């Protein structure tokens, strides 16, 4: 039984510490929407998405009112569309992107993910058409999010895809230059992409998933920070225990909301993603947890160790609370979406090199990082390759969301608005790797991949 003090503590988490459900994401399979006629594909996709997700926002709002738990976003993830486009060509891909955007608007969700492809071992014709369409699709739509999986720990790294994505990111930035290159904020490059991730912009509905499913992403950096702050003299082992207990409570709440949403919609419940997802709001920062643990500023020596402690404790606490843990499940460090990280970059405490080191021990990777507008496509590709390699070698998901902002230089600020926040432009090493990137081919999988 819950004690009165635990109930009061949970209410305080919601009212004072920014605890919320970050997203309820409905996964929808589009595999039965394939057809030889692009018009027929778009029609099938539109009808299926609007039919299955038509009540998602309504049900989410109902649960929010009944339980008093804020649910920030309701979203949709679909099958990677490269699997259904067949011979549609680039124009067909763009028509499908507009169809997804229209369907998302009609059901009232703010993002729909799955304009995606998996090319870790090579390209089909459809993969190439979809990747070529990305800059225009992301510029022409408001709600569509895209992702490209360029590597796995079993297959190695497709460097041809990495090189291509460097150029795609540059073109996407140019096409949305009047909106601070916002198109790049909706594009993720993955290694070991999960099939059940509820968070945008990298969500898609994997081929091993059911026809329709509800996945939930929780939040709560502010709750964890306050838990740490209540123990100013505790050793690190005691702090890890306190973080585990806090993560347990957060995860239980997420599972409650996920199961109730799935029940009311008549679809299966999938997973709870344990990720601590920050926002630009004061007191809702992963960087501030690191600082509460005793690191003077996020990025200072000790940051990577503190982040590893946090990430591990969150996973252990969450795994005790639910048998349905999935997605990314760790601590997110998106620079523009975390008030503490924004301050650390502006103060010179946190740079790209340290950020890359941090990604080796936490969830996702180099995320929402704004770069100078004159950063070359080859340098962007090399940054992607470095980050993707961390994921491949360590058998974990890593991802890259880089935003080269046209006309901006290192140290200047860029505003994205909303949950995407604002950030200083980060300085990039002025030495290049163009020859390495243009060699192409595939970087073989590590020997640790041979584990059967």
Swiss-Prot record:
- Pfam families in UniProt: DUF711
The entry sums up its family as follows: Belongs to the UPF0210 family.
Quaternary data: Homodimer.
Q: What is the protein name given in its UniProt record? A: UPF0210 protein Daud_1353
Instruction: Please report the organism this UniProt entry assigns to the protein.
Output: Desulforudis audaxviator (strain MP104C)
């Amino acid at each position: 039984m819950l004690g009165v003090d635990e109930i009061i503590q949970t209410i305080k988490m919601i009212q004072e510490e920014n605890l919320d459900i970050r997203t309820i994401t409905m996964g929808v399979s589009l595999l039965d929407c394939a057809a030889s006629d692009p018009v027929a594909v778009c029609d099938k996709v539109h009808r299926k998405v609007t039919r299955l997700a038509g009540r998602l926002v309504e049900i989410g709002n109902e649960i929010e009112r009944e339980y008093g738990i804020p649910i920030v976003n309701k979203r949709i993830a679909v099958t990677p569309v490269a699997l259904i486009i067949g011979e549609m060509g680039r124009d067909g891909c763009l028509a499908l992107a507009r169809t997804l955007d229209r369907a998302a608007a009609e059901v009232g969700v703010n993002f729909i993910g799955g304009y995606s492809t998996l090319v870790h071992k090579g390209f089909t014709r459809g993969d190439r058409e979809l990747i070529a369409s990305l800059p225009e699709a992301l510029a022409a739509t408001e709600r569509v999010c895209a992702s490209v999986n360029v590597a796995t720990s079993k297959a190695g790294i497709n460097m041809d895809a990495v090189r291509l994505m460097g150029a795609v990111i540059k073109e996407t930035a140019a096409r949305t230059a009047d909106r601070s290159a916002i198109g790049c904020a909706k594009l993720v490059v993955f290694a070991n992409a999960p099939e059940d991730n509820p968070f945008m912009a990298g969500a898609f509905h994997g081929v091993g998933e059911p026809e329709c499913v509800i996945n939930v992403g929780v939040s709560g950096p502010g709750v964890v920070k306050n838990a740490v702050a209540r123990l100013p003299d505790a050793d690190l082992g005691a702090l890890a225990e306190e973080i585990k207990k806090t993560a347990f409570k957060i995860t239980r709440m997420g599972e409650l909301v996920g199961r109730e949403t799935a029940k009311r919609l008549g679809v299966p419940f999938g997973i709870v993603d344990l990720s601590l997802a920050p926002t630009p709001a004061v007191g809702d920062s992963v960087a501030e947890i690191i600082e509460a643990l005793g690191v003077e500023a996020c990025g200072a020596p000790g940051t990577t160790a503190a982040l590893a402690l946090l990430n591990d404790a969150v996973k252990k606490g969450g795994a005790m609370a639910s048998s349905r843990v999935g997605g990314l499940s760790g601590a997110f460090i998106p620079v523009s979406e975390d008030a503490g990280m924004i301050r650390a970059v502006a103060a010179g405490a946190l740079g790209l090199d340290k950020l890359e080191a941090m990604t080796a021990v936490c969830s996702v990777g180099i995320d929402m990082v704004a770069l100078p507008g004159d950063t070359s496509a080859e340098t962007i590709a090399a940054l992607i390759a470095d980050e993707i390699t961390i994921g491949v070698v360590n058998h974990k998901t890593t991802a890259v969301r880089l935003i080269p902002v046209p006309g901006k230089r290192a140290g200047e600020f860029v505003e994205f608005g909303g949950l995407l926040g604002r950030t200083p432009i980060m300085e990039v090493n002025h030495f290049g790797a163009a020859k390495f990137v243009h060699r192409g081919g595939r970087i073989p999988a590590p020997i640790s991949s041979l584990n059967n």
